[in-house]
UniProtKB/Swiss-Prot annotation:
Keyword Zinc-finger: yes
Classification via InterPro entries: Leu-rich_rpt_Cys-con_subtyp (IPR006553), LRR_dom_sf (IPR032675), Znf_RING (IPR001841), Znf_RING/FYVE/PHD (IPR013083), Znf_RING_CS (IPR017907), Zyg-11_UBL_adapter (IPR051341)
An example molecular function term from Gene Ontology annotations: zinc ion binding
RING-type ZnF: 10-46
Protein name: Putative adenylate cyclase regulatory protein
SUPFAM superfamilies membership: L domain-like, RING/U-box
Source organism superkingdom: Eukaryota
C-alpha cells in the first residue's frame, strides 16, 4: 500500500504501531514489523530501504505529537478547507453552488462528526479526500450507485466511524470481508446492494448494534453469522433469503429488540424466533409461506409493535391476546382472519390496521380500546356492524376506504379529536351531516362518494387543510367551500355536474389546487385572487380556452394544463419567475409565441411537451440550459 501515512499509525495497516515497530533508513518512516516484510522500498515515500532498526517508544510518541501539531497548524482552527475538499471529491468540477459543497458546509458546522452525501453520486468522483476527516463518526453514501469499488474501499480507512449508510451502492463481498477494520461501528445499512452474496465478514463487527440488509436479494451465505452478533439490537432483513435455520442462531438471551423479516418467503416456521423474548418490534409482513409456529407470538410479552400483514394462516386473534403491551398492530390482508376474540384485551393499542380483512364483520371489540388513535378498516367487505366506533374518544385517524356498507356519517360525529378521515369509496353515503362536529379535522378524502350533492354540512371545519374530492358525479353545489379559509390543498377531480367554481376563488390560503376533468370549467378569472398558489393542476379541462391571469401567480412553482386541447392562451407566462415544473402535454392549440416565453423562465427544471407543437429552437435552448424535457 502506497501513498499518504496516517498520523500516529502505520501507513500500511492503518493501526497504531504494534510492539516492536521498525524505523526504516534512510527515510526514517516507522511501520509495524509485519507490514514491511520482504519490502525493498518504503511503503510511504517509495525510497529504497537501506536498512532498518527497532523504533524507540519515545520516537513513536514524538512522531505522533509533532505530526498532529503540524496538522493543526497547516489547516487552522477549522481543520478542513471546505472548497478544497469539495473540489477533491468532485474531481475538480465542483462549484460553491453544488450539492457537495452545501453538504460539506453542514458537516463543518457540526465539527465534521456527521457527513451526509446521499444522492450525490452524479457529482462524487474521488473519495480519497475523506481520509482527512479523521473525526467522522456518521457517514451516508446511500444512492451513490456510480461510485466504483476502489472508491468505496476508502470508507474503510475511516476508523472512527460509528454509523455508516451505503444503501444501493456497489459494495460487494470483498468490501464486506474488509469491514472488520471499522472496530467501533454500531450502525450499518447496505440495503439494496445487489453485489453482496456473502456477509460472513460482518461477523467481525462485534460492536454492531443495528444492521439493515433490506432487499439484498443475492445474499446466500452468512445470515447465521450475523444473527449471532452479541450486541445486535436491531436487525432488518426485509426481502432477503434468510431461512428458519438462520434465525435459530439468534441468541435467546441476546439484546435484539427489533426484527424485520418482511417478505422473506423462505420463512415457514416461527418457532425459530420463539425464544427471543427481548423483542419489542417484529415485522412479518408478506411472509406468505409461514404455516407453523403462530402460537409462539403469545410469548413475546415485551412486544410493542407487530406487523403480520398478509399471513394466510392467521384465522384467530387468540394467539395475540397475551400481547398486552402492544401499541401498534397490523393484520392487514389476512384474508382468513375472522375470529377477533382476544383483541379487546389489547387495551394499550394506539394503532390498529385491519384493512383487507374480508372476514371481519363487527367492530364491537374496539369499545375497550380507549387508547386507540388510528384505525384502518379499509376494504373490510363483510363489515356490517360499526358499534364501538362512537366510543373511541381518542381516535385521531380513521380510514374507511371502500367500506361500502358504511352509510351513516353520524356514527362518528362524537369523535372530537379526529384529524384525518378517509371516506373514499363509501358510495352509499348521501350526506355529510355529522361531520360539522369534527372541529379539529385537518384532512378529508371523499373519492368516489357518488351520492354526495353538497358541501354545506362541512362549512364550519375551519381547521381543514387538505380536501380530496374525486368522481363525486352528483356533486353540484360547492358553496360550502368558501368558508374553509384554512384550506391549503384542494383536489377536485371528475365532478362533472359542477358549474359554479366561484367558492374556490375565496380560498386565499390554498397552496395546491387541482381541478381535473371538470367538464364545465371555463372561467378562470378568479385565479388571480389565489396569490399564494404554488402548484396548479388543470388536467383534461377541455372547455378552457384562455388563462389570462396566470402571470399574477408569482409564487407558482408547478403548472400543469395537460390535455386541455382547446387552450390557446397563457397570459403572462413569462412573469412566473419561480416556476420550476411546467406540463403542457396535449395542449395542441397553443401558438409558438407561448412556447417562446419558456426561454425567459429562469428556474425552469422540468418541461413536459408531449403532443404539443413546441418549436425546435425552444427545445434546443431548454436542453442547453439543462432543463429535463419529456
Amino acid at each position: 500500500m502506497t501513498g499518504r501515512s496516517t498520523y500516529g499509525m502505520c501507513a500500511v495497516c492503518r493501526e497504531p504501531w504494534a510492539e516492536g515497530a521498525v524505523e526504516l533508513l534512510p527515510c526514517r518512516h516507522v511501520f509495524c514489523t509485519a507490514c514491511v516484510v520482504q519490502r525493498w522500498r518504503c511503503p510511504s515515500c517509495q525510497r529504497r530501504i537501506g536498512g532498518r532498526r527497532k523504533a524507540n517508544p519515545h520516537l513513536l510518541r514524538e512522531i505522533a505529537d509533532v505530526t498532529m501539531e503540524l496538522k493543526r497548524y497547516r489547516k487552522g482552527r477549522s481543520g478542513i478547507d471546505v472548497t478544497q475538499m469539495a473540489r477533491k471529491l468532485g474531481g475538480g468540477g465542483v462549484t460553491t453552488s453544488s450539492e457537495i459543497f452545501r453538504r460539506l458546509e453542514g458537516s463543518k458546522n457540526g465539527r465534521w462528526k456527521i457527513l451526509n452525501l446521499s444522492g450525490c453520486g452524479s457529482e462524487l468522483q474521488d473519495l480519497t479526500a475523506l481520509r482527512d476527516l479523521e473525526a467522522l463518526e456518521d457517514l451516508d453514501l446511500s444512492e451513490c450507485a456510480n461510485l466504483e469499488l476502489r472508491e468505496l474501499m476508502v470508507v474503510l480507512t475511516l476508523r472512527n466511524l460509528r454509523k455508516l449508510r451505503m444503501k444501493r451502492t456497489m459494495v460487494n463481498d470483498m468490501w464486506c470481508s474488509s469491514i472488520g477494520l471499522l472496530k467501533f461501528l454500531v450502525h450499518l445499512e447496505v440495503d439494496g446492494s445487489r453485489g453482496v452474496t456473502d456477509i460472513t465478514g460482518l461477523f467481525r463487527l462485534k460492536t454492531l448494534e443495528a444492521l439493515s440488509l433490506d432487499n439484498c436479494i443475492n445474499i446466500t451465505k452468512g445470515f447465521d453469522k450475523i444473527c449471532a452478533l452479541p450486541q445486535l439490537t436491531s436487525l432488518s432483513l426485509c426481502q432477503t433469503n434468510v431461512t428458519d435455520k438462520d434465525l435459530r442462531c439468534i441468541h435467546p438471551d441476546g439484546k435484539l429488540k427489533m426484527l424485520d423479516i418482511s417478505s422473506c418467503h423462505e420463512i415457514t416456521d416461527l418457532t425459530a424466533i420463539g425464544g427471543v423474548r427481548s423483542l419489542e418490534k417484529l415485522s412479518l409482513s408478506g411472509c406468505w409461506n409461514v404455516t407453523k409456529g403462530l402460537e409462539e407470538l403469545c410469548k413475546f410479552s415485551n412486544l410493542r409493535e407487530l406487523d403480520i400483514s398478509g399471513c394466510l394462516v392467521l384465522g384467530s386473534a387468540v394467539v395475540l391476546k397475551n400481547l398486552i403491551n402492544l401499541k401498534v398492530l397490523s393484520v392487514s390482508n389476512c384474508k382468513n382472519f375472522k375470529d377477533l376474540n382476544g383483541l379487546e384485551r389489547l387495551v394499550n393499542l394506539e394503532k390498529l390496521n385491519l384493512s383487507g380483512c374480508h372476514g371481519v364483520s363487527s367492530l364491537g371489540f374496539v369499545a375497550n380500546l380507549s387508547n386507540l388513535k388510528e384505525l384502518d378498516i379499509s376494504g373490510c367487505e363483510s363489515l356490517v356492524c360499526f358499534d364501538g366506533l362512537q366510543d373511541l374518544n381518542n381516535l385521531e385517524v380513521l380510514y374507511l376506504r371502500d367500506v361500502k356498507s358504511f352509510t351513516n356519517v353520524g356514527a362518528i360525529k362524537n369523535l372530537s379529536k379526529m384529524r384525518e378521515l378517509d371516506l373514499s369509496g363509501c358510495e352509499r353515503i348521501t350526506s355529510l351531516s355529522g361531520l360539522e362536529t369534527l372541529k379539529g379535522l385537518e384532512e378529508l378524502s371523499l373519492e368516489g362518494c357518488g351520492e354526495i350533492m353538497s358541501f354545506d354540512p362541512i362549512w364550519s371545519l375551519y381547521h381543514l387543510r387538505v380536501l380530496y374530492v374525486s368522481e363525486c358525479g352528483n356533486l353540484e353545489d360547492l358553496s360550502g367551500l368558501q368558508c374553509l379559509t384554512g384550506l391549503e390543498e384542494m383536489y377536485l377531480h371528475g365532478c362533472r355536474k359542477c358549474t359554479n367554481f366561484g367558492p374556490i376563488w375565496n380560498l386565499r390560503n390554498v397552496c395546491v389546487l387541482e381541478l381535473s376533468c371538470c367538464e364545465n370549467l371555463d372561467d378562470l378569472s378568479g385565479l388571480q385572487c389565489l396569490t399564494g398558489l404554488e402548484e396548479l393542476y388543470l388536467i383534461g379541462c377541455e372547455e378552457i380556452t384562455t388563462i389570462g391571469v396566470v402571470g399574477n401567480l408569482r409564487n407558482l412553482k408547478c403548472l400543469s394544463t395537460c390535455w386541455c386541447a382547446n387552450l390557446k392562451e397563457l397570459g403572462g407566462l413569462e412573469r412566473l419567475v419561480n416556476l420550476e415544473k411546467l406540463d403542457l402535454s396535449g395542449c395542441c392549440g397553443l401558438s409558438s409565441s407561448v412556447f417562446m416565453e419558456l426561454m425567459s423562465l429562469p428556474k425552469l427544471q422540468w418541461f413536459y411537451g408531449f403532443g404539443s407543437r413546441v418549436p425546435d429552437i425552444v427545445l434546443k435552448e431548454l436542453k442547453r440550459r439543462g432543463v429535463h424535457i419529456f
